């Protein structure tokens, strides 16, 4: 008898991706974040769809429509805060997922890694445009400051900024197009995720040892489906606790003031998940230099496969490289803290030192340490 699961053209794809997929038997909880990101994306699309039913992308009514969602729509407050805090969860998992890739050498899957970086850019763009939509003070000024950075591009910069704005300042045209892009991008991200998975399933998953695990594979279902469900349970407990008890913990109070082009907030800053990049941007006292450093801080991830100089793939058995990895993590925490501080002494110099350390660790220290470890092992 034909097994539908294995013979049906559509179900067969699902079967090979989530049921009969051969998976290393030793992957740890660090491998849960991929599925958690998938759940987050689904949650964001769903809550976003319901928000879009009540939201109006017009400068005169955008702020009021968000207030209306929270006050008058059935469970509108829940949908809105799930969407806002879901974005924070999304970025936490993204950073964990990337960190796992760096630690265990998953970046040696070049295709999967590079499409992952493109996904990161797409998610960052989506989150930025979503932050503009409530049309609060920080929405307006955040949009003004960040889009204005493009004016640093030589020759075409100023024209490009006005083209993106749809006028001579951030206004109705900007809000309308940001809403359109914010709505369409998650679906493009979903398509990119499928390509990401396609490339991953070409090679199979990495594992903590970094060694070939073909001799020891187990089916994805039921072992890892159960494990993923546990991860989702922990995620939902955390997210619901955040939404129910402190929904505004990660937001900015300035965004509860309607956008006013005549009144600049004392400290313009993006959402917490962009603060590390914002700190790098601000640490260079030159517009173009800052923009280049900002883009480089993310694009540098593309260099990891090229700069991999160790004879071992994973950092599991490389204690010196592990120290550098955690130095990098600590440094990113410092950058995140600095990004939220005013531009004054001592924060300026701390930010500059942390920015230099970030690039120096990735470009010089990590490859050098890997070579030194090779020498220690007489390889």
UniProtKB/Swiss-Prot annotation:
Transmembrane segments: 33-53, 77-98, 113-133, 178-198, 226-246, 288-308, 320-340, 347-367
Recorded superkingdom: Eukaryota
GO cellular component, as recorded: mitochondrial inner membrane; respiratory chain complex III
CC cofactor: heme b
Note: Heme 1 (or BL or b562) is low-potential and absorbs at about 562 nm, and heme 2 (or BH or b566) is high-potential and absorbs at about 566 nm.
Cofactor annotation remark: Binds 2 heme b groups non-covalently.
Lineage: Eukaryota, Metazoa, Chordata, Craniata, Vertebrata
Compartment(s): Mitochondrion inner membrane
Protein name: Cytochrome b
UniProt binding sites for heme b b566: 97, 196
Residue positions binding a ubiquinone: 201
Keywords assigned by UniProt, alphabetized: Electron transport, Heme, Iron, Membrane, Metal-binding, Mitochondrion, Mitochondrion inner membrane, Respiratory chain, Transmembrane, Transmembrane helix, Transport, Ubiquinone
SUPFAM superfamilies: a domain/subunit of cytochrome bc1 complex (Ubiquinol-cytochrome c reductase), Transmembrane di-heme cytochromes
Chain residues that bind heme b b562: 83, 182
Subunit structure: The cytochrome bc1 complex contains 11 subunits: 3 respiratory subunits (MT-CYB, CYC1 and UQCRFS1), 2 core proteins (UQCRC1 and UQCRC2) and 6 low-molecular weight proteins (UQCRH/QCR6, UQCRB/QCR7, UQCRQ/QCR8, UQCR10/QCR9, UQCR11/QCR10 and a cleavage product of UQCRFS1). This cytochrome bc1 complex then forms a dimer.
Bilayer topology annotation: Multi-pass membrane protein
GO MF assignments: metal ion binding; ubiquinol-cytochrome-c reductase activity
Assigned protein family: Belongs to the cytochrome b family.
Described purpose of this protein according to its UniProt entry: Component of the ubiquinol-cytochrome c reductase complex (complex III or cytochrome b-c1 complex) that is part of the mitochondrial respiratory chain. The b-c1 complex mediates electron transfer from ubiquinol to cytochrome c. Contributes to the generation of a proton gradient across the mitochondrial membrane that is then used for ATP synthesis.
One GO biological process term: mitochondrial electron transport, ubiquinol to cytochrome c
């Amino acid at each position: 008898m034909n097994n539908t699961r294995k013979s049906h053209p559509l179900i067969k794809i699902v079967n090979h991706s989530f049921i009969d997929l051969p998976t290393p038997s030793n992957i740890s909880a660090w491998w849960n974040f991929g599925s958690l990101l998938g759940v987050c994306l689904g949650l964001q699309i769903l809550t976003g769809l319901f928000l879009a039913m009540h939201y109006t992308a017009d400068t005169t009514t955008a702020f009021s429509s968000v207030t209306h969602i929270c006050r008058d729509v059935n469970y509108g407050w829940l949908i809105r805060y799930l969407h806002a805090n879901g974005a924070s969860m999304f970025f936490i998992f993204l950073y964990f997922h990337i960190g796992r890739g760096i630690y265990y050498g998953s970046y040696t899957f070049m295709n999967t890694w590079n499409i992952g970086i493109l996904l990161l850019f797409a998610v960052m763009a989506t989150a930025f445009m979503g932050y503009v939509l409530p049309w609060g003070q920080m929405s307006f000024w955040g949009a003004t400051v960040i889009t204005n950075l493009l004016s640093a591009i030589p020759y075409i910069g100023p024209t490009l900024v006005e083209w993106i704005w749809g006028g001579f300042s951030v206004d109705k045209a900007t809000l309308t197009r940001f809403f359109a892009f914010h709505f369409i991008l998650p679906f493009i991200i979903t398509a990119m995720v499928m390509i990401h998975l396609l490339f991953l399933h070409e090679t199979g998953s990495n594992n903590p040892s970094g060694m070939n695990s073909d001799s020891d594979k187990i089916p994805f279902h039921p072992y890892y489906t159960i494990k993923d469900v546990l991860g989702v349970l922990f995620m939902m407990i955390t997210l619901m606790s955040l939404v129910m008890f402190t929904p505004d913990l990660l937001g900015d109070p300035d965004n509860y003031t309607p956008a006013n082009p005549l009144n600049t907030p004392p400290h313009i800053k993006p959402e917490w998940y962009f603060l590390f990049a914002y700190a790098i941007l601000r640490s260079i006292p030159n517009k173009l230099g800052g923009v280049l450093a900002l883009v480089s801080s993310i694009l540098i991830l593309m260099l990891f496969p090229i700069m991999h100089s160790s004879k071992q793939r994973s950092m599991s058995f490389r204690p010196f490289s592990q120290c550098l990895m955690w130095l990098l993590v600590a440094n990113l925490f410092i950058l995140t803290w600095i990004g939220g501080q005013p531009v004054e002494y001592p924060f300026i110099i701390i930010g500059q030192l942390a920015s230099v350390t970030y690039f120096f660790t990735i470009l010089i220290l990590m490859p050098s340490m890997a070579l030194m470890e090779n020498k220690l092992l007489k390889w």
